[in-house]
Amino acid sequence: MIRGRGQCLRERAGWTPNFGETEGSMNFNSRALAAEAVGTFALVSAVCGAALFSAPSAGLVAVAFAVGISVLAMAYAVGHISGGHFNPAVTLGLIAAGRFDSGKAVPYIIAQCAGGVVAAVIFYMILGGAMGGGKWNTFTAISNTYGGMGQFGLGAAFLMEVVITALFLIIIIGVTSRRAPAGFAPIAIGLALTLFHLMSIPVSNASLNPARSLATAVFGGVGALSQLWLFWVAPILGAVIGGVVGRYLQEE
């Protein structure tokens, strides 16, 4: 069967309509899990690095762009190996959209969480003795929380996370559709992630990603850990909604 040049380029880049789907031997699956761990490691490193060490004047803009750029770069780097999820909510949303094998969900999520936690451990070590006991307070500040950053409470944080994660999945499914221009999916996904961080950092410190929330909460103290449930439930709920809606919109 003769296929168009755009479709061939998309398949060679790993951004097929079956986004994130992997096949083949155990060795290939091991590489896919390693790619997910490395990609999530890079994402959480971007969050920690930008939030902890960027100039105060840069604020949320630095964090938002760091996250977007990290996902864009890693999607091009390893997206053809694993599909470039780097996010348990994305994995589950793609299952809801019929784009990913549910049997691979648990290994993917474990790899993502492991990569994120390792990144948080490294940045906790980088802070070292410079801040003493203040390291815990610093990680609390970059963890996903509600109620402590202003007037936004549990309901606002939950709704924000559901909405932005649903929109994120709709975008992912759309830009990886067979009918979408080839080669641009990582750019659109990275820019969308930047936008959603700009929107949600003042409300919930921007999660969209349970692995990212877990990673920073590990060193964020009791407060961050006690609120962690929201940043698993809301993004996953939003991702499933977005997966179902995205599948409906892209049906041919």
Give names to the regions the model predicted.
Residues R3, C8-R10, W15-E252:
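Membrane-interface helix-loop junctions and terminal tails of multi-pass membrane proteins
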